[in-house]
């Protein structure tokens, strides 16, 4: 302090910085609201209009998505993958933006790839990679791969495998991962109707949306429709309901009404019990956890089956180099645990 220039003086104590607007306040699962600054109605309506326009650019919903997942026999695989995403978010205290973004990446990537037959480990690899990507875009501190894979999976993957799979997914999605989700749209919508400070209703909306994303049938609706329908169901104030519907054109209103009916007809209790059962299952130890996958090389992002075939090739090449006579069948795609080190 004796060498200060211009005879400036140090403050007695550091000033407490003012909180920045729109920063997420999320220290626990019970706190899911954002600290929105005061925004006028016109600005919020503009934000909603921008979200609706952005939603059209991603085209990540519709009957074609539902039909695709059913035709590829991916309904159960998708459900369990999304259960794992939700459980991992809770275990690592990740943001809700992260889990909804990961689910969005998963659906879009799986839909645009050409794979004749999906298996459990393929789906788990895409789910792990999608969550890894989403956390890097949404979290201040990105969890390690070991932390992501700690619970709930039947396979473990090498860090190099996930890193290269990240590039494959990002290239396939053209690096466009900031899609509108039902969660992000719900945050905008509740700000418009003045519900930001109501923690209880915000928690109910978020929990309802977490149940909804696991339901393949809800994928036929745009995220904005799903978010609006969820808020509509949980609200009883007729004035608020009318103010919500007045934000949309007639075509959108009809979709919202249809989605509301679909949500009411869902067996939500059954879905929730399945999730609680899955969360309560005993966790497999590392020695029981299945196979560690490794992948090297450049692959065509248009054909997922070719990407996965490389595991068979790398396994056989390694075995030949070690002069091993007994090569596992190609369908097993098993790699030694030592490769995970």
Curated annotation (Swiss-Prot):
Keywords: Cell cycle, Cell division, Cyclin. The keyword Plastid does not apply. SUPFAM superfamilies: Cyclin-like. Coiled coil: none annotated. It comes from the Eukaryota. InterPro entries: Cyclin, Cyclin-like_dom, Cyclin-like_sf, Cyclin_C-dom, Cyclin_N. The keyword Thylakoid does not apply. One of its GO terms (biological process) is cell division. Belongs to the cyclin family. Cyclin D subfamily. This is Putative cyclin-D7-1. It comes from Arabidopsis thaliana (Mouse-ear cress).
